[in-house]
Amino acid sequence: MFEYVTGYVEYVGPEYVVIDHNGIGYQIFTPNPYVFQRSKQEIRVYTYHYVREDIMALYGFKTREERLLFTKLLGVSGIGPKGALAILASGQTGQVVQAIEHEDEKFLVKFPGVGKKTARQMILDLKGKLADVVPDAFVDLFSDEERFDEKKGSSAELDEALEALRALGYAEREVSRVVPELLKESLTTDQYIKKALSLLLNGKR
């Protein structure tokens, strides 16, 4: 229904952003809302209009490729919008695609809500069908350019990041395990989320 929404970021929360377009605020659920910052600069968010009997929502993405992977994930039995967002929030799209192509169930089950059965279904449904999802279209989440000076981070950003992890479906015990590592750094909310997800997907669970 909507290809994209262009406007200004009015609100950023753990699960969604609000984009103001001509005086109308669009609530858009995104994989990691904190990649969007409130500013007077106009942005474009590529959207997916999700409609079911009990829900109608807009999901938003920074690129068409990210949205494409989201729609492909929704086509897998056992994966709903929240699960698909949690997978995309990791920012490790290339690894997700590689895991599917190499039938790496151990990697896939690290995502919240993905058990062995769902991981197998992802492989069965998507293997060989992700050539149009280009990993290079996604921002490198851990590039040196994104590192913040230590003086710029604060506990407020970390608190927001932890809240976002819980919203993605990670259990409190999982969140608690990555906190010591996160406390060693001083990052933006977005970077804390990406760092935490990297730790969770690489064994800190």
Swiss-Prot record:
A Pfam family annotated for this UniProt entry: RuvA_C
Region called Domain II, residue ranges: 63-141
Domain of life: Bacteria
Compartment(s): Cytoplasm
Region: Domain I, residue numbers: 1-62
Keyword ATP-binding: no
GO terms for cellular component: cytoplasm; Holliday junction helicase complex; Holliday junction resolvase complex
Annotated stretches, region: Flexible linker: 142-152
Region Domain III, residue ranges: 153-205
UniProt entry keywords in alphabetical sequence: Cytoplasm, DNA damage, DNA recombination, DNA repair, DNA-binding
InterPro entries: DNA_helicase_Holl-junc_RuvA_I, Hlx-hairpin-Hlx_DNA-bd_motif, NA-bd_OB-fold, RuvA, RuvA_2-like, RuvA_C, RuvA_C_sf
Gene Ontology terms describing biological process: DNA recombination; DNA repair
Any GO MF annotation of the entry: four-way junction DNA binding
Signal peptide residue numbers: none
Similarity remark: Belongs to the RuvA family.
Domain writeup: Has three domains with a flexible linker between the domains II and III and assumes an 'L' shape. Domain III is highly mobile and contacts RuvB.
HAMAP family noted in UniProt: DNA_HJ_migration_RuvA
Protein name stated in the entry: Holliday junction branch migration complex subunit RuvA
Species of origin: Bacillus anthracis
Taxon lineage: Bacteria, Bacillati, Bacillota, Bacilli, Bacillales
